[in-house]
Amino acid sequence: SQPGARVGVLGHTRWASVGIISEPNAHPVNSEELESAADAAYLVAALNGDVDNHADLRARHELRLAQPITTDAKVIPALVSRSLAKGATLPEAFRETVASFDGSVAIAAASAEQPEMLLLALKGSGQGLCVGLADNRFIVASEPYGVVEETQHHSRTQ
Protein backbone atom coordinates (compact mmCIF):
# COMPACT_ATOMS: atom_id res chain seq x y z
CA SER A 1 0.00 0.00 0.00
CA GLN A 2 1.29 3.44 -0.92
CA PRO A 3 -0.33 6.39 0.85
CA GLY A 4 -1.69 8.88 -1.65
CA ALA A 5 -1.40 6.48 -4.59
CA ARG A 6 -4.29 6.63 -7.02
CA VAL A 7 -5.39 4.34 -9.79
CA GLY A 8 -7.79 5.27 -12.55
CA VAL A 9 -9.37 2.59 -14.70
CA LEU A 10 -11.57 3.24 -17.71
CA GLY A 11 -13.01 0.25 -19.50
CA HIS A 12 -16.00 -0.51 -21.65
CA THR A 13 -17.50 -3.47 -23.45
CA ARG A 14 -19.19 -2.37 -26.63
CA TRP A 15 -20.48 -4.17 -29.67
CA ALA A 16 -19.59 -2.07 -32.67
CA SER A 17 -22.61 -0.07 -33.72
CA VAL A 18 -20.35 2.15 -35.81
CA GLY A 19 -17.22 0.55 -37.22
CA ILE A 20 -16.21 -3.07 -37.45
CA ILE A 21 -15.70 -5.33 -34.44
CA SER A 22 -11.92 -5.25 -34.08
CA GLU A 23 -9.17 -4.63 -31.55
CA PRO A 24 -8.35 -1.14 -32.93
CA ASN A 25 -12.01 -0.18 -32.39
CA ALA A 26 -12.12 -1.54 -28.82
CA HIS A 27 -12.89 0.94 -26.06
CA PRO A 28 -11.51 2.94 -24.48
CA VAL A 29 -10.00 4.70 -27.48
CA ASN A 30 -7.15 7.19 -27.18
CA SER A 31 -6.51 10.64 -28.61
CA GLU A 32 -3.48 9.70 -30.70
CA GLU A 33 -3.49 10.72 -34.34
CA LEU A 34 -1.05 9.67 -37.06
CA GLU A 35 0.87 12.94 -36.73
CA SER A 36 0.15 14.09 -33.17
CA ALA A 37 2.33 16.84 -31.76
CA ALA A 38 4.82 15.59 -29.18
CA ASP A 39 3.15 17.71 -26.50
CA ALA A 40 -0.43 16.78 -27.45
CA ALA A 41 -2.66 15.95 -24.50
CA TYR A 42 -3.30 12.22 -24.08
CA LEU A 43 -6.88 11.21 -23.33
CA VAL A 44 -8.98 8.07 -23.40
CA ALA A 45 -12.73 7.79 -23.85
CA ALA A 46 -15.49 5.20 -23.91
CA LEU A 47 -18.82 5.71 -25.64
CA ASN A 48 -22.25 4.17 -25.32
CA GLY A 49 -24.48 5.38 -28.12
CA ASP A 50 -23.65 6.84 -31.51
CA VAL A 51 -21.96 10.03 -32.68
CA ASP A 52 -24.06 10.34 -35.83
CA ASN A 53 -21.94 13.12 -37.35
CA HIS A 54 -18.54 11.52 -36.67
CA ALA A 55 -17.59 11.40 -40.37
CA ASP A 56 -18.35 15.10 -40.79
CA LEU A 57 -16.32 15.92 -37.66
CA ARG A 58 -13.36 13.85 -38.90
CA ALA A 59 -13.40 15.73 -42.19
CA ARG A 60 -14.07 19.22 -40.78
CA HIS A 61 -11.25 18.95 -38.23
CA GLU A 62 -8.98 16.99 -40.59
CA LEU A 63 -8.43 14.28 -37.98
CA ARG A 64 -5.55 12.02 -39.00
CA LEU A 65 -6.66 8.67 -37.60
CA ALA A 66 -5.05 5.30 -38.22
CA GLN A 67 -6.78 3.43 -41.04
CA PRO A 68 -8.00 0.40 -39.05
CA ILE A 69 -9.88 2.67 -36.60
CA THR A 70 -13.45 3.07 -37.83
CA THR A 71 -15.33 3.61 -34.57
CA ASP A 72 -17.18 6.89 -34.04
CA ALA A 73 -15.81 7.02 -30.49
CA LYS A 74 -12.33 8.01 -31.71
CA VAL A 75 -13.46 11.58 -32.42
CA ILE A 76 -14.08 12.16 -28.70
CA PRO A 77 -10.52 12.12 -27.33
CA ALA A 78 -9.03 13.44 -30.59
CA LEU A 79 -11.24 16.54 -30.59
CA VAL A 80 -10.78 17.17 -26.85
CA SER A 81 -7.00 16.98 -27.33
CA ARG A 82 -7.18 19.42 -30.25
CA SER A 83 -9.26 21.86 -28.17
CA LEU A 84 -6.76 21.64 -25.30
CA ALA A 85 -3.95 22.51 -27.72
CA LYS A 86 -5.85 25.72 -28.55
CA GLY A 87 -5.87 26.74 -24.87
CA ALA A 88 -9.19 25.45 -23.54
CA THR A 89 -9.35 23.96 -20.06
CA LEU A 90 -10.15 20.25 -19.83
CA PRO A 91 -13.81 20.78 -18.81
CA GLU A 92 -14.25 23.43 -21.54
CA ALA A 93 -12.68 21.20 -24.19
CA PHE A 94 -14.87 18.26 -23.19
CA ARG A 95 -18.09 20.32 -23.15
CA GLU A 96 -17.25 21.90 -26.52
CA THR A 97 -16.56 18.48 -28.03
CA VAL A 98 -19.77 16.88 -26.74
CA ALA A 99 -21.81 19.91 -27.86
CA SER A 100 -20.58 19.31 -31.43
CA PHE A 101 -22.11 15.81 -31.56
CA ASP A 102 -25.33 14.78 -33.21
CA GLY A 103 -26.87 11.62 -31.80
CA SER A 104 -27.45 10.06 -28.42
CA VAL A 105 -24.36 9.44 -26.28
CA ALA A 106 -23.15 8.51 -22.82
CA ILE A 107 -19.42 9.20 -22.49
CA ALA A 108 -16.70 8.65 -19.91
CA ALA A 109 -13.27 10.15 -20.56
CA ALA A 110 -10.02 10.75 -18.69
CA SER A 111 -6.85 12.74 -19.30
CA ALA A 112 -3.27 11.79 -18.42
CA GLU A 113 -2.58 15.42 -17.46
CA GLN A 114 -5.42 15.53 -14.92
CA PRO A 115 -5.91 11.92 -13.78
CA GLU A 116 -7.95 12.98 -10.77
CA MET A 117 -10.74 14.19 -13.06
CA LEU A 118 -13.23 11.85 -14.72
CA LEU A 119 -15.30 13.48 -17.45
CA LEU A 120 -18.88 12.29 -17.95
CA ALA A 121 -21.48 13.39 -20.46
CA LEU A 122 -24.98 12.53 -21.57
CA LYS A 123 -26.56 13.92 -24.71
CA GLY A 124 -29.69 12.91 -26.56
CA SER A 125 -32.19 10.34 -25.39
CA GLY A 126 -32.04 6.68 -24.56
CA GLN A 127 -28.70 6.76 -22.73
CA GLY A 128 -27.96 6.91 -19.04
CA LEU A 129 -25.13 6.71 -16.56
CA CYS A 130 -25.20 5.02 -13.18
CA VAL A 131 -22.71 6.58 -10.75
CA GLY A 132 -21.85 4.73 -7.57
CA LEU A 133 -19.86 5.96 -4.57
CA ALA A 134 -17.95 3.66 -2.26
CA ASP A 135 -15.02 3.99 0.13
CA ASN A 136 -12.15 5.61 -1.80
CA ARG A 137 -13.64 4.99 -5.22
CA PHE A 138 -16.47 5.58 -7.60
CA ILE A 139 -17.81 3.41 -10.38
CA VAL A 140 -19.65 4.62 -13.47
CA ALA A 141 -21.55 2.43 -15.90
CA SER A 142 -24.32 2.77 -18.44
CA GLU A 143 -26.25 0.07 -16.57
CA PRO A 144 -26.57 -0.46 -12.79
CA TYR A 145 -25.17 -4.01 -12.95
CA GLY A 146 -21.96 -4.14 -10.96
CA VAL A 147 -22.42 -0.63 -9.61
CA VAL A 148 -25.13 -1.46 -7.08
CA GLU A 149 -23.23 -4.54 -5.88
CA GLU A 150 -19.97 -2.63 -5.36
CA THR A 151 -21.12 0.71 -3.95
CA GLN A 152 -23.07 1.87 -0.92
CA HIS A 153 -24.66 4.82 -2.74
CA HIS A 154 -25.59 5.16 -6.38
CA SER A 155 -27.63 7.35 -8.67
CA ARG A 156 -28.81 6.96 -12.25
CA THR A 157 -28.79 9.98 -14.53
CA GLN A 158 -30.74 10.15 -17.76
Which residue stretches match the model-derived regions?
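Conserved short alpha-helical segments that host acidic/polar catalytic motifs at enzyme active sites
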Residues: 1-158
